[in-house]
């Protein structure tokens, strides 16, 4: 019998602390959907962001590099898509990859993310949902 791979769903909500969710015991935050996901998955309780700036933090997550190594302080560097990418590693391991929502992997100038489809492929995503 072939073993199927577990799904990997990475939810990143703009540097939200892990304890600001119902499943983590917060009595103010009402997060029923996250609570259900956490009940059947993994929550990284000791994970910290590299930056309070979302674009900088996302670049660190994508590349595995610290801020002083990738140099992105405000606007992502599109050339980083040619380097190491955890999404590309996941895709190369046989998973289908996709992204939903904002990603800030290029300067936002309005328009449609589909205009950057080739860049998403270079980062390692199969599709922009």
Give, region by region, the residue ranges found by the protein language model.
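Formylglycine-dependent sulfatase
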Residues: 1-129
